[in-house]
Amino acid sequence: MAVREKIGIVVSNKMQKTVVVAVENRVAHPKYGKIVVKTKKFKAHDEENRCQEGDLVRITETRPLSRTKRWQVAEILREVKKL
């Protein structure tokens, strides 16, 4: 079975070794045809605590690590600049 991947933005890194990643999905409304942006949040494992809020990351599906965590951060695609 292929490994599922998603790309999203880190919206929270307040937990130890865990980040919340918001993934946008654009779908057409079935009746009206308007493109609607749907956002879903995934908890992902970040072993080294490298991710900051605003980073663009790729997450991959993994075995369940906790009750709500089934994804892990594969790589950071774009880091946010720190002031």
UniProtKB/Swiss-Prot annotation:
GO terms for cellular component: cytosolic small ribosomal subunit. Keywords: Ribonucleoprotein, Ribosomal protein, RNA-binding, rRNA-binding. InterPro entries: NA-bd_OB-fold, Ribosomal_uS17, Ribosomal_uS17_bact/chlr, Ribosomal_uS17_CS. Pfam families: Ribosomal_S17. One of its GO terms (molecular function) is structural constituent of ribosome. Transmembrane segments: none annotated. Disulfide bonds: none annotated. GO terms for biological process: translation. HAMAP family: Ribosomal_uS17_B. PANTHER family: 40S RIBOSOMAL PROTEIN S11 FAMILY MEMBER, SMALL RIBOSOMAL SUBUNIT PROTEIN US17M. Part of the 30S ribosomal subunit. Belongs to the universal ribosomal protein uS17 family. One of the primary rRNA binding proteins, it binds specifically to the 5'-end of 16S ribosomal RNA. This is Small ribosomal subunit protein uS17.
